[in-house]
């Protein structure tokens, strides 16, 4: 067992699962963290558990959050439809402050575990335009981690690792395949049905499908239509 630990934010989707595989390839003992935050696509929690089991992580933790009560996103508010037309600008699927909340909790757990790093599968190339997926956001949170934690003050700051941030979706798929990721276990769709079948029309589905097409890899995604 490795003597270096990492917390991996795992949604059950393509990117976060690849980030987990990268962390394992770098020799980290991995602790996966997922959130039940009132999201529309709750089957992602089943996928996160499935991925964590298949990849034999040290521990998988699910934290309960009530972001649904805040609303403001198509992923947490049933009255806001998930767009299927590739809108310009920041889409309504953006969940206000989500990555800030997630990373803050990951930071706390990482301190408790005496972990060295937190991995998050954000991407700023083939992505939906979320402000909390950009390199400058991650750099700002890294500064916060150095200032707001005991380990940071003591000169042993946790590293926020974003191995996918400058990669295309095709490059992510290709790397994951080389690392042995089983993408059939993952769910990326914003409105997947209870059987985990993807809609094939939302922005997340389009990006995922394009990634497999550009990588010239077979897409194992189960689509409802």
UniProtKB/Swiss-Prot annotation:
<comment type="similarity">
    <text>Belongs to the QueC family.</text>
</comment>
<dbReference type="GO" id="GO:0008616">
    <property type="term" value="P:queuosine biosynthetic process"/>
</dbReference>
<comment type="function">
    <text>Catalyzes the ATP-dependent conversion of 7-carboxy-7-deazaguanine (CDG) to 7-cyano-7-deazaguanine (preQ(0)).</text>
</comment>
<keyword id="KW-0436">Ligase</keyword>
<keyword id="KW-0067">ATP-binding</keyword>
<dbReference type="GO" id="GO:0008270">
    <property type="term" value="F:zinc ion binding"/>
</dbReference>
<dbReference type="GO" id="GO:0005524">
    <property type="term" value="F:ATP binding"/>
</dbReference>
<keyword id="KW-0862">Zinc</keyword>
<feature type="binding site">
    <location>
        <position position="202"/>
    </location>
    <ligand>
        <name>Zn(2+)</name>
    </ligand>
</feature>
<dbReference type="InterPro" id="IPR014729">
    <property type="entry name" value="Rossmann-like_a/b/a_fold"/>
</dbReference>
<feature type="binding site">
    <location>
        <position position="205"/>
    </location>
    <ligand>
        <name>Zn(2+)</name>
    </ligand>
</feature>
<feature type="binding site">
    <location>
        <begin position="10"/>
        <end position="20"/>
    </location>
    <ligand>
        <name>ATP</name>
    </ligand>
</feature>
<protein>
    <recommendedName>
        <fullName>7-cyano-7-deazaguanine synthase</fullName>
        <ecNumber>6.3.4.20</ecNumber>
    </recommendedName>
</protein>
<dbReference type="GO" id="GO:0016879">
    <property type="term" value="F:ligase activity, forming carbon-nitrogen bonds"/>
</dbReference>
<keyword id="KW-0547">Nucleotide-binding</keyword>
<keyword id="KW-0479">Metal-binding</keyword>
<keyword id="KW-0671">Queuosine biosynthesis</keyword>
<feature type="binding site">
    <location>
        <position position="189"/>
    </location>
    <ligand>
        <name>Zn(2+)</name>
    </ligand>
</feature>
<dbReference type="Pfam" id="PF06508">
    <property type="entry name" value="QueC"/>
</dbReference>
<comment type="pathway">
    <text>Purine metabolism; 7-cyano-7-deazaguanine biosynthesis.</text>
</comment>
<feature type="binding site">
    <location>
        <position position="199"/>
    </location>
    <ligand>
        <name>Zn(2+)</name>
    </ligand>
</feature>
<dbReference type="InterPro" id="IPR018317">
    <property type="entry name" value="QueC"/>
</dbReference>
């Amino acid at each position: 067992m490795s003597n270096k630990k990492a917390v991996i934010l795992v949604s059950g989707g393509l990117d976060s699962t690849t980030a987990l595989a990268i962390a394992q390839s770098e020799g980290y003992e991995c602790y996966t963290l997922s959130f039940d935050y009132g999201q529309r696509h709750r089957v992602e929690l089943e996928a996160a558990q499935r991925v964590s089991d298949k990849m034999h992580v040290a521990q998988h933790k699910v934290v309960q959050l009530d972001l649904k009560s805040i609303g403001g996103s198509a992923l947490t508010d049933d009255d806001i439809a998930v767009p299927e037309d590739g809108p310009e600008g920041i889409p309504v699927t953006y969940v206000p402050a989500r990555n800030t909340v997630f990373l803050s909790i990951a930071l706390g757990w990482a301190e408790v575990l005496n972990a060295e790093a937190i991995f998050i599968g954000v991407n700023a190339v083939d992505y939906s335009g979320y402000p909390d997926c950009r390199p400058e956001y991650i750099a700002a949170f890294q500064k916060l981690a150095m200032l707001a934690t005991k380990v940071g003050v003591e000169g042993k700051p946790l590293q926020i690792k974003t191995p996918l941030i400058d990669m295309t979706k095709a490059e992510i798929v290709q790397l994951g395949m080389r690392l042995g990721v089983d993408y059939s276990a993952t769910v990326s769709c914003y409105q997947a049905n209870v059987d985990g079948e993807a809609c094939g029309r939302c922005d997340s589905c389009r990006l995922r499908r394009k990634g497999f097409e550009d990588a010239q890899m077979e897409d194992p995604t189960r689509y409802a239509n």
